[in-house]
Amino acid sequence: METACERLHVAQETQMQLIEKSSDKLQDHILYWTAVRTENTLLYAARKKGVTVLGHCRVPHSVVCQERAKQAIEMQLSLQELSKTEFGDEPWSLLDTSWDRYMSEPKRCFKKGARVVEVEFDGNASNTNWYTVYSNLYMRTEDGWQLAKAGADGTGLYYCTMAGAGRIYYSRFGDEAARFSTTGHYSVRDQDRVYAGVSSTSSDFRDRPDGVWVASEGPEGDPAGKEAEPAQPVSSLLGSPACGPIRAGLGWVRDGPRSHPYNFPAGSGGSILRSSSTPVQGTVPVDLASRQEEEEQSPDSTEEEPVTLPRRTTNDGFHLLKAGGSCFALISGTANQVKCYRFRVKKNHRHRYENCTTTWFTVADNGAERQGQAQILITFGSPSQRQDFLKHVPLPPGMNISGFTASLDF
């Protein structure tokens, strides 16, 4: 029994060391899955012999141990095969070789280059799903491991093999619309590309969340292999200055659903657009008709009006920044590191800071592509409280922290 406890301890310690190492070498990840295999094999054998506690570790049910051991064996053997190909010299993170990613659609292949595709159903921002698509898929075939390119369009998520068989769809948004949509309408946003699609009903035009109108293409969205034509801004369609405030009014703020679509004033050029059967989601803070009347009555439409910024009041609710200035700590690392760190801080050191944000990323130039590491922002009531936090809360290896003080200009 002592030998089994020692072997279990070594296997678990090996896993922890490899996780903290954050290696990009495939051989290190093979060692990790070998250790997982050893751990669950020992636990399975112990459970079969009636042992419920091995060392300081409770032994799970034998079915759980068996399933985890099978997963580890499959991952170990697959990675060993992959390491013998030209892809073995590429950088691989532990996340790239995780079981969850390996089993995500399309299943049983390794994936890299994750990005998020947003699908909005019924033109309702609250009825939105997010799908992960990977740029590179490493797939096992009869001829060995091959690289496939993946992407998204108005029809669904697809990949293209080197054999040149065209786009192979493994998830279709039309099927998703049948589950989540009531009207059959859906729209797709992939980075800086926008697609429109219809699964069951038809509509001439749909309102886009970024202030553009996209015409529906067909019963299954865009045809395979064909990109949607670029959408035209509303201002170019109407040809009237009255449409200027539409984008400014929409912005990216959505306070709740509206019960009616946009109504353009007579003479503004809006007659070329037919009202969508799907209500537009979002709140326009200015009335377009009244704004048009004001502009028509104005003696000089080129005269600029002074911009009045909204002032903070005591009834606004929660505010991260205080009028007298706030002390901050900006903490960055991998998404999992930051998430675990925030959990430990909230659980054990809640009295040492004031507020903590959720995990966030900086957005790159192309759509919703992430750049840099995951980050959280922690606020403090005073520099002394921040100093106490830094003194008593350790920062795990691989994470970075920066301190700064910010004050409100308006």
Curated annotation (Swiss-Prot):
GO terms for biological process: DNA replication; DNA-templated transcription; regulation of DNA replication; viral DNA genome replication. Its main location: host cell. Residues 293-306 have a biased composition (Acidic residues). The modification Phosphoserine is found at S298, S301. Oxidation of Cys-340 in response to redox signaling leads to the loss of DNA-binding activity and the inactivation of gene activator or repressor function. Phosphorylated. Pfam families: PPV_E2_C, PPV_E2_N. One of its GO terms (cellular component) is host cell nucleus. Residues 198-239, 263-282, 289-314 are annotated as: Disordered. Disulfide bonds: none annotated. Residues 325-410 are annotated as: DNA-binding domain. It is found in: Host nucleus. GO terms for molecular function: DNA binding; DNA-binding transcription factor activity; nucleotide binding. Changing W130R: Loss of ability to bind to DDX11, no effect on ability to bind BRD4, loss of attachment to mitotic chromosomes, and interference with the maintenance of replicating viral episomes. Gene3D superfamilies: 3.30.70.330, E2 (early) protein, N terminal domain, subdomain 1 (1.10.287.30), Papillomavirus E2 early protein domain (2.170.200.10). Inactivated by oxidation of Cys-340 to a sulfenic acid. Residues 1-202 are annotated as: Transactivation domain. Keywords: Activator, DNA replication, DNA-binding, Early protein, Host nucleus, Oxidation, Phosphoprotein, Repressor, Transcription, Transcription regulation. Belongs to the papillomaviridae E2 protein family. Binds DNA as homodimer. Interacts with protein E1; this interaction greatly increases E1 DNA-binding activity. Interacts with protein L1; this interaction enhances E2-dependent replication and transcription activation. Interacts with protein L2; this interaction inhibits E2 transcriptional activity but not DNA replication function E2. Interacts with protein E7; this interaction inhibits E7 oncogenic activity. Interacts with host TAF1; this interaction modulates E2-dependent transcriptional regulation. Interacts with host BRD4; this interaction mediates E2 transcriptional activation function. This is Regulatory protein E2. It comes from Bovine papillomavirus type 1. The lineage of its organism: Viruses, Monodnaviria, Shotokuvirae, Cossaviricota, Papovaviricetes. The gene is E2.
